[in-house]
From Swiss-Prot:
Subcellular location: Cell projection, Cilium, Flagellum
Organism the protein comes from: Mus musculus (Mouse)
Protein name: MORN repeat-containing protein 5
Ranges of the MORN repeats in the UniProt entry: 8-30, 31-53, 54-75
Keywords, comma-separated and alphabetical: Cell projection, Cilium, Flagellum, Repeat
Stored InterPro entries: MORN (IPR003409), Morn5 (IPR042814)
Domain of life: Eukaryota
Keyword Transcription (UniProt): no
């Protein structure tokens, strides 16, 4: 644990993590559930720093069945997912609380939206610097390096931090 920055609170059997436990990753993602032979095994939940969670049944470290719930309570559906698509373009908060009047459009599910640093992209779990290809969480802690596919997706899809628009002369 000391080399990875992780923390483990639970039992050991033959030097392996086993039984009911809490495992905290360096990113502050927490797993609370069953372990067997050092792996997630049985029922367990991943709690993410963003407030979202993934409840699952695990077998030898792999997901058998799971359910992802966003921090606002929206549950992901892997079939017939119509969230914020061409079928229904509303954000979850707009579904729950209604649309705003014309001229006060909502840009993200979070309203008001998060301020994005100049030249960076908001990729959902942090800010992405396209020059260094590094994604840091919203508290400026390293999350990961983006591979070519993720870089292309972020640049094509995500909101970018721009300079404020100059005021028009009346």
């Amino acid at each position: 644990m000391q080399y990875t920055g992780s923390q483990y609170f639970g039992e050991y059997i033959n030097g392996r993590m086993e039984g009911s436990a809490e495992y905290i990753l360096p990113t502050d993602t927490r797993y609370i559930g069953e372990m067997k032979d050092g792996m997630f095994h049985g029922e367990g939940t991943l709690f993410f720093p963003s407030g979202s969670r993934f409840d699952a049944i695990w077998k030898k470290g792999l997901v058998v069945k799971g359910k992802y719930t966003f921090n606002d309570g929206l549950q992901y559906e892997d079939k017939h997912w119509h969230y914020c698509d061409s079928y229904d373009r509303r954000f979850y908060t707009e579904i729950c609380y209604g649309l705003k009047p014309s001229g006060i459009s909502q840009l993200t599910n979070m309203d008001p939206p998060r301020r994005i640093p100049l030249g960076y992209y908001d990729c959902g779990d942090g800010f992405y610097n396209p020059t260094t290809r590094v994604i840091k969480d919203y508290r400026n802690r390293f999350l990961r390096n983006a591979d070519d596919d993720e870089h292309e997706w972020i640049v094509r899809t995500c909101r970018k931090g721009w300079l404020p628009m100059p005021k028009q002369k009346s």
